Each structure stands twice: as C-alpha cells, then as structure tokens.
A protein has these predicted regions:
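N-terminal Rossmann-like NAD(P)+-binding domain of SDR-like oxidoreductases, especially those catalyzing
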Residues: 1-177
Length: 177
C-alpha cells in the first residue's frame, strides 16, 4: 500500500497490531508516515506478541494500548481522547479449530468488537466523516472452500463454513450496512 507522503497529520488506530499481519502494517505506517501518530490497540491474546514490534516500540509516533475491542466504555473513551482520524481494523479471533470449540468467543470479538469500533467511530465524528476512513480486514474464508481450481472475486456469494468464517462474514455485513 503506497500512500502520498504529503498527507496531513493523522491519528491512526490499528487494531490487532501485535499479530502477525498487524505488526507488519504497524511497522509500515510507523516508518513511512512520521507525521502520523500510530496507536496500536491489541489485547495480547495467544495471537498477539509485542516482540513483533521491538524495532518500532520507541518510535516517537508509536503508542501501544492494551485493550479489548469489545469493551465499549474503553473504546469510546479512547476515541474521545485521541480523536482517531482513521481505523485499520485487523483484530480478530482467527483460528478455525478454536472457533469450533468456542464459537461464542469468535462472535464476541469478530462481530461485537467490530460493531463497538464502528459505533465509536460514528459517534466521534457524527456527521463529519470527510477525510476519515474505517478499513475493515476480512478473510477469503467468508466465501467458503475453493477447491483445486477457480478463484474468488468481490462478487462471489458468501458461503462461510466455520464459526470463524461466519463471524467474519457477519462483521463484513455490519461494516457495509
């Protein structure tokens, strides 16, 4: 992802930034956009590890927040305090096998957590969304199983086949609504 370097100062919230993919996204923004303040919000569950970010932890434009995206009071307070201009939402329960043994945890984080973030974003900016962005990261698993050949596109019908993919499909629909 290449963005213009001349973009104004922003307060960017990245959820799930201590995870494998999230840490790469955090690092990219911390290093490439010194005029942004990057807030990494992560609950540090089994999938998050701050060791992934040792090289940027002392950067002037980087802040870590340990919090749960389903905690509405905390999330609302953070949005009010920091006035995030943009959100990149990567936080998720993402292990298919775990979703089968504990589907409620996946519904809570992936659906409710996304809704809490969306509501905080909406309530913070009310009717002034100009220049504000909410990027929601999903998974190809919402489309089901591909098989040996073929491909998925943005017009492929949803066909989730695990609690994980069903929870991500649901969160996709809330973001689009």
């Amino acid at each position: 992802m290449i963005l213009p370097k001349n973009m104004k100062n922003k307060n960017l919230l990245i959820t799930g930034g201590a995870g494998f993919i999230g840490s790469h996204v955090v690092r990219l923004f911390v290093n490439a956009y010194k005029n942004y303040t990057i807030y990494n919000l992560d609950m540090l569950t089994y999938a998050g590890n701050l060791e992934n970010l040792k090289d940027v932890e002392s950067a002037d434009n980087y802040k870590f927040i340990k919090a749960d995206i389903t905690d509405e009071n905390t999330i609302n307070s953070l949005f009010e305090e920091h006035q995030f201009t943009d959100v990149i939402h990567l936080a998720a329960e993402s292990h298919v096998d775990r979703s089968i043994t504990d589907p409620l945890a996946f519904a809570k984080t992936n659906i409710l957590g996304t809704m809490v973030l969306l509501n905080a974003f909406k309530n913070t900016w009310k009717d002034n969304f100009e220049g504000k962005r909410f990027y929601h990261v999903s998974t190809d698993e919402v489309y089901g199983t591909l098989g040996e050949t073929g491909l998925f596109t943005e017009t492929t019908s949803y066909d989730p086949n695990s609690p994980y993919s069903a929870s991500k499909a649901s969160s996709d629909h809330f973001v689009r609504a």
